[in-house]
Amino acid sequence: MNSRTLGRIESRSRRSESGSTRKAIFLRNNVIKVPNLSRKDTQLMGETILLDAAKGLTLNELKFWDYKFDNILNQFFTEWRIWICCPENLRHLLAPIRQFGFTEKGIPYTIMKKMEVFTEEEADDFDCTYACCSIDELGDILCEDYDVEVWDNFGDDVWSLCNKFGLGIADFDSNCGNLGFEYEGEAEIKRVRFIDYGFKIHGGKDNRWNPVISELISA
């Protein structure tokens, strides 16, 4: 994996075999989040993400607050294709998502069908190594392969996790489950960063799920 510091969101174009140009967003250290707009502006969220990403802006300081999830990401993934490159030991997590559209945590097919998965060798020019799965699934792999312990990131568990491992919280909203943290580990992994797209389903405090984009940077 590439150990260079990756600190910006970049947008590029890649020409497919058929000759058509497909946009690709490269998620680096930063997570795409959107400004804390009023609910009436929800329909504009996708356009906001595209505009900011196209400018190459750093968005990790902006907060993803309480918005209707589908309005944002369905519009977002309709226009943009996410290119995901992941290590071989994580790639098997993506196969069932691509085939069936849902994981145990409920990641919707409307998101995953827009993604394409590559090995590192297939995507060297992308300069990224990302996997997308639930935090529980990714946590199991990391615990097994890298001796890093993580667990569900809702409610008080977040604070327990951070206190136990001395993790630094980058952004957390107890209502929506937004969290970004880093763990300075050993062995092959220098930094493990989990950043999730959190949202609230009205009518139940814990009736929600979070897809996770995790970055693994080698020492």
Please annotate each region the language model reported.
Residues F64-F154:
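Conserved structural core of kinase catalytic domains
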Residues G168-A219:
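Catalytic activation segment of kinase domains across protein kinase-like and atypical kinase folds
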Residues I25-N29, F102, K114, E182:
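Active-site beta-strand termini and strand-to-loop segments that position acidic
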Residues L138-E188:
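Conserved kinase catalytic-core segment
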Residues L37-R39, F102-T103, M115-F118, G177, ...:
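Short, solvent-exposed loop/turn segments at secondary-structure junctions
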Residues M1-S13:
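Juxta-kinase regulatory segment immediately upstream of eukaryotic protein kinase catalytic domains
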Residues N30, L93, T110, E188-I195:
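Protein kinase-like catalytic core scaffold
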Residues E10-C86:
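ATP-binding glycine-rich loop module of kinase domains
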